[in-house]
Amino acid sequence: THKPVNLYMNTDLQNYSHKRLNILTGEWVLVSPFRANRPWQGQNEELSNGKRSAYDEGCYLCAGNTRINGEQNPKYKDVFVFTNDFAALQKESNPFISKDGLLEAHGEQGICKVICFSPDHSKSLADMQPVEIGKVVSAWQREFAELGGVEGINYVQIFENKGAVMGCSNPHPHGQIWSQSSLPNEVIKKDQHQLSYFKKNTRTILGDYIAQELVHKERVIFENHFFVVLIPFWAIWPFEAMIVPKKAQKDILELSDLEAVLFAEAIAVLTKAYDKLFNCSFPYSSGIHQAPTDGENNNHWHWHMGFYPPLLRSATVKKFMVGYEMFGSPQRDITAESAALRLKSLID
């Protein structure tokens, strides 16, 4: 057994290989800070920082344009939501269960939607004002309530893939909302760990975690009256970040009008800092993890929004999850503390 030490300002964390526990999933990430400056002769991504016009006649998501299925978009003025023309889940899917020895398959029902953040083809969330992002937040709330209320829908996943390097098929500012009958793998892990902690402590694990982070703030990059933006202690991606409400809430429907405004502010601050980091339109995948819509109490849930950006050391060098990370566990070089310092310095 090892004697516990105070992790604050522990120089071992900045100099030696170690692993860190993700309290939400129970998984570990290997941290190798001494590798941060290793030479790079690998792949460099193409930098697509060319200026885009506010309207693209060939874009399927621009206002007034016709989508691939023949439907015409309305001339929307702010946020536009529609059912995905190429949905990954089918509402009418047969809820079958098929078993053959060790082989098992279950039918999965769901509804997938696309949410256009703005009619302006050239904008990302980082380019939008908090009041504009607030309209996106309101749309997320409406869709979460509507989809979560559909019979047989037990989970609603809100997410965004930004940038071609993240597999985004259209540069128009947009995200997606997938709702389904079962809980996804990541959500199952987070549900179990949050429930276990809540049963023992009658408090949410993220509430206690945020309270601890706010003591020294070495991983906190921004906070307002209701939200904390930080690099999680267990972050996997180089500049991974998380937005967490200071008060325990199980989903975004519990946000007051003022809290929704402060959520939009937190998103604006983080995404603008990202763009300044390498002077580019910073790619990432982001998503909101919140309580299932299965009709259960779910008071152990503390919703949060994660940002997983791939860029490592420049606008053209990204982190690859390969080799050991595919067969062993995730690994990172730059520490969460170093990443937090860099991002915090970019916030006005």
Show which residues each predicted segment covers:
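Active-site microenvironments that recognize anionic phosphate/pyrophosphate groups
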Residues: 5-172, 178-258, 271-272, 283-284, ...
